[in-house]
């Protein structure tokens, strides 16, 4: 690729972003549902609601800003301008993070550290980035100001940095230092400044790239803050057909936001996820897309929606069978619709429909085909009332599955639990007891020992070559699934606890050697519901070394933000200190995760 550039040819990278489709789909849904034509290219870049969302770290689904470490950084930085958003894009990369620039930027912005410049003359150049050269353009301006570089010379310096060409950087040293001396700066300072620039060469980022990505990040955050139902519907549509963990994360985020995601409904659902904001007294919700149901193709969905749009909602299952195109009455597709709950609103039970739908379809198809061929009823009259056609109709029994079976069928057809979840009522315990979620494991260190909670959805036991027993299990939490490997030694201790549909907490080591992260099981314990494991106090260990006054200030702020009914005890060395009746917290509000970010994963002793 270097030879192509040397020939003078232009090299351009084109990046296809799914998020651009999410933005355009959101704009269409906003126009359809509330009649607002939003000009996405001219949004106000000082929107308070958007910055509040980002400062709280509520950025799941926001371009570039949704990973757990990024959300933690945003809470520390509290972005309040578009420039902060662009800086986040540049800072959240291995180089700047290894140099602790991301924390320096956050601390300097919020007056936790003084803003320092390598020379007073640099203030006018680096004031907007708090004295840090986080962009290549910052380095170019320093070279022009301090070494008298022309714009072309500064651009050559930028190229050397951007391509990480160390040899080219060394060639620049002599011209840079001599240039600074000619500008009246001493030799020592010139060496120091070039050394600073050389360090930044490892991670300085292109400003136009950061601002371009930052704008898309801001636009998606704005849409989530102001039009959450439409945005989340478009976001979930964008991951339709992708790995199910993606949609599970966004489904859980909808629940966190207080948005209901309803099972698909033959009377209200569209091809894709759709915001249902005209629901009478009910809060706005998102209805699951019909085409996202397993075994239900887009062709069938188009025919179904066409009939509904032409002749109104379906009255019951008999009416549905009588009206839709015969292609829709595909047994495989109808079974999938039933299991997914798409006929629930018609007043039928899922078990009742599964017991009778084949006979109803057979009866309907036979009669409709006879009618098409000119075969009339006994009285040679076609009644207008569908119920008259079904004088001998097959009855739908009023029987229903147990909750677990209904949810199992939902997951089979939709890839995830929608109407409910086996872990509903366990959320607080999961936050208190666990260090990570299934989807957070991939960002942890190899070999790190963690606790992850969930429900066991699959157990596969097998014998090793030596005849010993081991197992692999699928553990599902509210964000997705992760594979847990139980080797022989652990199997002897915990094998009796491994059963499908059982809520458990797994203690294990992170294994990231393969493409998909796994957990090597060490222990398994029962996961108790929030009601069973209700706590009256929490214990927080504060490290004896490395804890600063700022850490303690952040602790006080967190405890104040998460006020509740639980007492708080702080462990300092061998002392256990009660913080008093005025300091009580809600441990299920996300506090424990914040404390782990502040003091480390092992700080919660409760």
Locate predicted features.
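Noncatalytic, beta-rich nucleic-acid-contacting surfaces in large DNA/RNA-processing enzymes
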Residues: 1-606
């Amino acid at each position: 690729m270097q030879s192509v550039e040397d020939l003078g040819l232009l090299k351009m990278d084109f990046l296809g972003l799914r998020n651009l489709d999410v933005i355009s789909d959101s704009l269409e849904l906003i126009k359809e549902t509330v009649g607002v034509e939003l000009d996405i290219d001219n949004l106000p870049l000082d929107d308070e609601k958007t910055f509040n969302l980002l400062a709280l770290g509520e950025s799941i689904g926001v371009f570039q800003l949704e990973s757990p470490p990024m959300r933690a950084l945003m809470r520390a930085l509290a972005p309040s301008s578009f420039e902060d958003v662009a800086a986040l894009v540049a800072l959240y990369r291995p180089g700047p993070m290894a140099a602790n620039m991301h924390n320096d930027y956050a601390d300097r912005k919020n007056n936790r550290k003084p803003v320092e410049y390598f020379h007073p003359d640099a203030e006018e150049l680096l004031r907007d980035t708090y004295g840090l050269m986080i962009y290549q353009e910052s380095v170019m301006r320093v070279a022009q100001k301090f070494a008298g570089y022309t714009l072309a010379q500064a651009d050559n310096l930028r190229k050397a940095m951007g391509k990480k060409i160390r040899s080219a950087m060394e060639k620049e040293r002599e011209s840079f230092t001599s240039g600074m001396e000619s500008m009246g700066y001493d030799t020592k300072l010139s060496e120091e400044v070039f050394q600073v620039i050389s360090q930044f060469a490892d991670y300085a980022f292109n400003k136009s790239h950061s601002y371009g990505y930052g704008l898309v990040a801001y636009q998606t955050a704005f849409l989530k803050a102001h039009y959450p139902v439409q945005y989340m519907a478009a976001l979930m549509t964008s991951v339709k057909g992708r790995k199910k963990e993606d949609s599970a994360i966004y489904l859980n985020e909808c629940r966190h936001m207080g948005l209901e995601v309803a099972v698909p409904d033959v009377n209200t659902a569209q091809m894709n996820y759709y915001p249902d904001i005209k629901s009478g007294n009910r809060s706005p919700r998102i209805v699951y897309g019909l085409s996202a149901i397993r075994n239900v193709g887009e062709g069938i969905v188009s025919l179904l929606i066409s009939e509904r749009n032409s002749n109104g909602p379906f009255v019951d299952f008999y009416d549905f069978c009588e009206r839709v195109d015969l292609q829709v009455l595909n047994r495989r597709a109808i079974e999938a619709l039933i299991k997914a709950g798409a006929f629930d609103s018609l007043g039928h039970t899922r078990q009742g429909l599964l017991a009778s739908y084949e006979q109803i379809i057979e009866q309907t198809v036979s009669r409709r085909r006879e009618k098409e061929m000119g075969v009339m009823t006994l009285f040679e009259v076609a009644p207008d009332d569908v119920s008259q056609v079904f004088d001998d109709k097959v009855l739908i029994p009023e029987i229903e599955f147990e909750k677990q079976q209904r949810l199992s069928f939902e997951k089979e057809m939709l890839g995830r639990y929608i109407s409910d979840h086996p872990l509903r009522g366990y959320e607080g315990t999961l936050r208190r007891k666990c260090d990570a979620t299934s989807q957070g494991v991939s960002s942890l260190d190899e070999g790190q020992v963690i606790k992850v909670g969930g429900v066991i959805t699959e157990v596969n036991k097998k014998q090793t070559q030596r005849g010993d027993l081991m197992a692999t299990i699928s553990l599902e939490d509210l964000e997705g699934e992760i594979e847990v490997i139980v080797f022989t030694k652990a199997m002897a201790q915990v094998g009796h606890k491994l059963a499908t549909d059982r809520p458990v907490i797994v203690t294990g080591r992170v294994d990231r050697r393969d493409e998909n992260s796994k957990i090597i099981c060490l222990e398994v314990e029962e996961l108790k519901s929030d009601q069973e494991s209700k706590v009256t106090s929490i214990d927080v260990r504060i490290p004896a070394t490395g804890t600063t006054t700022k850490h303690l200030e952040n602790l006080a702020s967190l405890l104040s933000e998460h006020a509740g009914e639980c007492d708080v005890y702080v462990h300092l060395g061998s002392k256990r200190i009660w913080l008093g009746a005025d300091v009580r917290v809600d441990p299920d509000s996300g506090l424990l995760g914040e404390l782990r970010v502040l003091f480390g994963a092992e700080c919660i002793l409760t």
